[in-house]
Amino acid sequence: MLHFVGGKNTFDQHHGPLFIDENFANIRGPGEAIGIHSGHHEGLQRNHFRFQEGKFHCGQVNILLALKDIGPGDGGTVIIPSSHKSNIRHPEFEKNSMKKGKVTSAENMTASKEIYLKAGDGLLFVDSLCHGSAKRTNKGERRIVVYRYGPSWGFFRHPYRPSKKLLSNLTEFQKKIVMPHEQVLSPNNKENKII
């Protein structure tokens, strides 16, 4: 993961080697899907992609681990190859993008590729790659675990924080990955407690 997130002796590793931004399980049943999202055209710092002087500098790298086989009809992850390098929005992006209250999927987009995995397989990709999922048409559930890593200067996008108990059980190296910031200041945090 260090190979993709940032370079040694750069600002990307100012607080630690990298940052595990989030991890979660995703369970999806028949008829469910995730519309296309991300893409380099959005220009977000959080999920940027850059390759310079022989080194990767990725704002967020995802690892999807299949807990069950994912084949045709199982709602596999869909990617748009090379979209992490394009500054131009895919012409079918809006039609297939994530929308609240509406199930959209990405498997019929031009140039899209649905990825099939065996239980235990992992899929690694930079978050600026346009991705989503196909609609699950088979019975049963698609089950995956997602881990997202980024440079040490990143911070949680959701209000979840590692517990003091978890942090006390980690090595110093592990702590730098799970919580690279020793103290986080906030204008609403008068006592300057870690938030």
Name every feature range the model reports, one short phrase each.
Residues F93, G122-L124, S128-I195:
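Non-heme Fe(II)/2-oxoglutarate
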